Amino acid sequence: MTTALQQPSLSSQCMAEFLGTALLIFFGTGCVAALKVGGASFGLWEISIIWGVGVSMAIYLTAGVSGAHLNPAVSIALSIFADFEKRKLPFYILAQIAGAFCGALLVYTLYSNLFFDYEQTHHMVRGTQASLELASVFSTFPNPALTTAQAFLVEVIITAILMGVIMSLTDDNNGLPKGPLAPLLIGLLIAVIGSSMGPLTGFAMNPARDFGPKLMTFFAGWGEISFTGGRDIPYFLIPVFAPIVGACLGAAAYRGLIARHLPSALPATKDAAPAIDGKPRTS
């Protein structure tokens, strides 16, 4: 006899999404803060690895309660191409954005004296173009050489790759079951994407990861430039909408190009059903 497990409430799932997203932002932006104002010495690969491990730890923390989406783009894609309940979607997204905001706020609070010292030493005024150097500790801004359209395309492509591989790693029909290794492999995937494409857009791939910290820097004194990135258009819209488009494309591509072609077990027929002695029955 099997015992049915009680499913977590929606409020518990949202709390898990809040905590998981806050944790990954805490580790990721904390690493960048250490580099920018703390005197640490990290290369691109080390930063990408820390972001990836932070995501892995957040997944391990929350997967059993909420499924560890930790990303509105993932939640939206799963609501369209998987069995995630659409009624939960707005609550998950709000929890993820709030978690990202609080994770960034916690890092800012802990490093605040170092931020002030850096600004005084470099005669930096918040809200100016120069202050984007420190605002980028918390959220992403594109390489100046990229147009806005190119930045949008980069985020679409890398998020599509992220979503497609996430679906493959969590699909037990696709090769050997990944089980407890899946979060580590997802973290490694993020590190690989970050180390290869990070210099272009900062590899947001997550609307909450970018918008929540941008909101925090807006209130912390950076103001409007937090959202525009010093461009003529509100750049914050790019890492909000491009990952959503990319995640949906990645999920659709996995479903259409990979999942539908995976071998699946055929239902047993009467003629093929084994007898007690192990030999097949014949009609």
Question: Where are these predicted regions, by residue range?
Answer:
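Membrane-interface helix-loop junctions and terminal tails of multi-pass membrane proteins
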Residues: 1-283
